UniProtKB/Swiss-Prot annotation:
Protein's name according to its UniProt entry: Threonine--tRNA ligase
Family per record: Belongs to the class-II aminoacyl-tRNA synthetase family.
Keywords assigned: Aminoacyl-tRNA synthetase, ATP-binding, Cytoplasm, Ligase, Metal-binding, Nucleotide-binding, Protein biosynthesis, RNA-binding, tRNA-binding, Zinc
Its job: Catalyzes the attachment of threonine to tRNA(Thr) in a two-step reaction: L-threonine is first activated by ATP to form Thr-AMP and then transferred to the acceptor end of tRNA(Thr). Also edits incorrectly charged L-seryl-tRNA(Thr).
Short name of one Pfam family: tRNA_SAD
Cofactor remark from the record: Binds 1 zinc ion per subunit.
Organism for this UniProt entry: Bifidobacterium animalis subsp. lactis (strain AD011)
Subcellular location(s) per record: Cytoplasm
Gene3D superfamilies in the cross-refs: 3.30.54.20, Anticodon-binding domain, Bira Bifunctional Protein, Domain 2, Threonyl-trna Synthetase, Chain A, domain 2
Binding site residues for Zn(2+): 360, 411, 538
One CC-aspect GO term: cytoplasm
InterPro entries according to UniProt: aa-tRNA-synt_IIb (IPR002314), aa-tRNA-synth_II (IPR006195), aa-tRNA-synth_II/BPL/LPL (IPR045864), Anticodon-bd (IPR004154), Anticodon-bd_dom_sf (IPR036621), TGS (IPR004095), Thr-tRNA-ligase_IIa (IPR002320), Thr/Ala-tRNA-synth_IIc_edit (IPR018163)
Signal sequence coordinates: none
Amino acid sequence: MAEAHISITVNGEAKEVEASQTGVELFADDKNIIAVRLNGELRDLYTPLHDGDNVESVTLDSPDGTGIMRHSATHVMAQAVQEVRPDAKLGIGPVIENGFYYDFDVKDPFTPDDLKTIEKHMQRIIKSAQRFQRRVVSEEEALREEADEPYKIELIKDKEDALETEAAVDISHKELSMYDNLDREGNVVWSDLCRGPHLPNTRYIKAFKLERAAAAYWKGSEANPMLQRIYGVAFPTKDELKAYQTRMEEAAKRDHRKLGQEMDLFSFPDEIGPGLAVFHPKGAAIINAMEDYSREMHRKNHYSFVQTPHITKGGLYETSGHLQWYKDGMYPPMHLDEEKDENGNIVKQGFDYYLKPMNCPMHNLIFKSRQRSYRELPLRLFEFGTVYRYEKSGVVHGLTRVRGLTQDDSHIYCTREQMKDELKNLLNFVLKVLKDYGLNDFYLELSTKDEHKFVGSDEIWEEATNTLAEVAEESGLELVADPGGAAFYGPKISVQARDAIGRTWQVSTIQLDFNLPERFQLEYIAPDGSHQRPVMIHRALFGSIERFFAILLEHYAGAFPAWLAPVQALGVPVADEFAPHLDKFMNSLEEDLVRVETDNSDDRFGKKIRNASKSKVPYIIIAGEEDMNNNAVSFRFRDGSQLNGVPVDQAKAWILETITKRVQVNSVDDFKAATGQPVENVEFGVADTDAE
């Protein structure tokens, strides 16, 4: 009897195949294919195919394929942990950027030696080519099989809650499934609750490394047990893993926490508390330069500057919805203004006051403070507003995740007719300013509606999303979709910037809001006299000053361009007798607001130069006998190159020019390119100034 056939579409091409086929047979000739996208859903290669299916191949080196490989590596790690620690109870194990983690409940924390042992067990499991096999199970079967895994039982019983968290890697809204690891004889050697998909077998995991272990609360809540989390990375090839490790070594050298201490920029005193930074004079100089330029650009782009208090009555956040949606991220209330008589009876009711977590409610009150006309729109409000968010102590990280942060916060109110032009101008403004700070490699991410969680009409969501997409496409930048990733109140574009070593940072966000104008009953008078709701746009260009400071510090590895550098010019006299001449020049720079220092210590000249070089200052200004006799100074740059005998007036003009142009200068060549041709009789070259 002839084998029955089915009609399917494979990578866009119609095919007739045997009814019993799976992706394994369909793609048997291409070992780089490790999974399929079946009717739009990622599935294992072993998934049976049916008539009418649309099948797309997924290769190991694709984003989807790499994610599947990393999740399979998570299972291999969990299996290895339970071999090494049989009493370990399983939490969850999602994929994260570059790798994965898994949470375990164990008696003793994992040590570096434990990680080495676990890696060896993983290597053995990988070499044994264990096959991943999926089984659909009922809730009763899952509870029975996971009887010794209390955290898995919790996920099974609370499926709906689990779907809203990283536990969704284990739980599907459709069905429950187990994944068995089978040895070459087909025996089950390990199992885990998981929605999948997974690799055909473990040998597809070519390059991995366990990085570290850390404590983590179950489901991220301090009310839950403390678990041990193991982090790992995995890549399709060993070369990619090696390249990643090289990048991480460079990232460690650029760590803003390390550089901040070495360069005396900021600190986190224990007396103040976690996530609350203090900026030292040099760090504050950088902050001031960042803010000054931002203010200048906002003035040029017709923003109105506002200022709002740090605390407010809780009723404002009831109106905005923050107390409903965001209370866990807010500091506890302060009950104030209550008055009692001598008997303790309340004679005047008090109010709960909160530290503000966001500036937008107060900006809405400014908009609402009087009647608005369409002639006033677009109205662009801007503030460097400090906000306070209660981040768990285990989450705070240097300046990138803090509890007190200052946002360069803007809220734009416009008509629907103005929305496209406003968004276009806003994106161009954001990109221009980011480029001036030295970030030039961008892509955009468009977060669209979650069909199950949104406010506002489908019509306005569609209009706003299409408008954002048009604006993004007109920018010429790569646009990456984030389906369902928008907040409930509106779609968003985020600007993702790559730094000097290729890492991606989310910097600016442009967020439409259909919620707050309704909650605050914001209105303007339209040309026909009717009352209309404005379109509201949230925009944070830096995100926060603190986080953007950290990004720039790591991007430049502390070697800021002169306009941002905490010390822009450092004077080093060759000998004491030349100090007065040098001091006169440095004072003239300071009169023009150049940030200067002079090393008048007792150190020998060579040591002063070495110390100056370590400080990453853009311009080391040297004065020796020839400089003094010719009323000149010499420059030494970060790369060790030197420019000698520059007349003081020309030297000052060049320094001011490079600061004004906001260019990076690390060498003589950079300096020449920034300032044009040097004056007559001035030579560019390298001089030996390290001699004692």
